[in-house]
Amino acid sequence: MLEPQRQVIQSYGDGGFKISGLDHAGSVIVTALKTQSWNLASIAEIDVKEFCGKVKSLGELNVLLLGTGTSTLAPNPKLGANLQNLGISLEIMDTGAACRTFNVLVAEERLIAAALIPT
């Protein structure tokens, strides 16, 4: 049986991402097996309840990387607490660092997702 293709973030910038050979404009949420659009332009737009519901629907996760653009910006403090209640650790960093970290952790077969705002 063939394993589904793992998602690899190949590049980022100019308002989007190249992930496993496909171009994605705007923000995205990436897991090891899929990439989906995320209708968000900045960290300030995150609705904690809606976002936590979206993350919960992704399946089993241990870590969520939040790439906040060109610099590291703090989201609503309730976001980390709500994700922790779901058993998910939130790691906040600039988008470039989040992309690199995602690729390493996916290669290690960790239960991870990345929510990425483009640079």
Where are these regions (language model features)?
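Short glycine-rich anion-binding loops that position phosphate/pyrophosphate groups of nucleotides
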Residues: 35, 69-71, 118-119
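N-terminal, charge-rich interaction modules
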Residues: 1-40
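Short acidic loop-to-helix transition motifs that present clustered carboxylates
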Residues: 95-100
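Compact, glycine-rich, soluble single-domain proteins
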Residues: 31-58
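Mid-chain, well-packed structural core segment of small domains
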Residues: 54-92
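Short glycine-/small-residue-rich flexible loop motifs, especially phosphate/cofactor-binding loops
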Residues: 14, 80, 102
